[in-house]
């Protein structure tokens, strides 16, 4: 089916272009959401008549998205989740969790604007891509940790995936001779 795009759609085309798409994609996504019109003579004349209005609305949406992007770009958010000693989360951080975190900070982002290839399943610093508009794309950083203190340590660059790093155990302080003191047991070293 051929459609006329009413806005820029990534991997498909620019506003005003006539593109051929699969029928299901047009019927279930593009047409109901108002992102395209069927490519027939009546709709072509309708599009040309409304082109200036559509371009102005698109420019307004882009400027709003750019304002949000200027505030959000490069920002870091702390996500506290329970995890095992190896750093594996008990659960995951998915797109809906990112939306909730940003919503708590006062940003209105939709779940379809968060681009995560796979859910986050380990502690650490993770970059998340947000597509606020077809032409405005930014990255935010999620600091996934077990506690706020651990998040601060991760932000400073510490690797917290081993038990020693998590609990601050010093390898040099734990020598076998510290655990066994022959004089404390009443055994002489000469007798042993």
From Swiss-Prot:
Keywords, ordered alphabetically: Ribonucleoprotein, Ribosomal protein, RNA-binding, rRNA-binding
Xref: Gene3D superfamilies: Ribosomal protein L9, C-terminal domain, Ribosomal protein L9, N-terminal domain
GO cellular component terms, A-Z: ribonucleoprotein complex; ribosome
One GO BP annotation of this record: translation
Composition skew (Acidic residues), residue ranges: 179-192
SUPFAM superfamilies: L9 N-domain-like, Ribosomal protein L9 C-domain
Molecular functions (GO terms): rRNA binding; structural constituent of ribosome
InterPro entries: Ribosomal_bL9, Ribosomal_bL9/RNase_H1_N, Ribosomal_bL9_bac/chp, Ribosomal_bL9_C, Ribosomal_bL9_C_sf, Ribosomal_bL9_N, Ribosomal_bL9_N_sf
Pfam families according to UniProt: Ribosomal_L9_C, Ribosomal_L9_N
Region entry Disordered, spans: 173-192
Sequence similarity: Belongs to the bacterial ribosomal protein bL9 family.
HAMAP family: Ribosomal_bL9
Protein purpose: Binds to the 23S rRNA.
This protein's name: Large ribosomal subunit protein bL9
Organism of derivation: Rhizobium leguminosarum bv. trifolii
């Amino acid at each position: 089916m051929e459609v006329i795009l009413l806005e820029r759609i990534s991997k498909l085309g620019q506003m005003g272009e006539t593109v051929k798409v699969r029928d299901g994609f047009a019927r279930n996504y593009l047409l109901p959401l108002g992102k395209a019109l069927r490519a027939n003579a009546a709709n072509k004349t309708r599009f040309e008549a409304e082109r200036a209005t559509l371009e102005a609305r698109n420019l307004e949406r882009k400027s709003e998205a750019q304002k949000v992007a200027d505030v959000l770009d490069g920002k870091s958010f702390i996500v506290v989740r329970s995890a095992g000693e190896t750093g594996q989360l008990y659960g995951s951080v998915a797109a809906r969790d990112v939306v909730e975190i940003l919503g708590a900070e006062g940003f209105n982002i939709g779940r379809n604007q968060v681009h995560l290839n796979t859910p986050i399943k380990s502690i650490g610093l993770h970059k998340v891509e947000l597509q606020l508009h077809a032409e405005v794309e930014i990255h935010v950083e999620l600091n996934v940790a077990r506690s706020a203190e651990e998040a601060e340590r991760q932000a400073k660059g510490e690797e917290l995936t081993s038990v020693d790093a998590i609990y601050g155990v010093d390898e040099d302080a734990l020598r076998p001779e510290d655990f066994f003191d022959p004089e404390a047991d009443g055994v002489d070293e000469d007798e042993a």
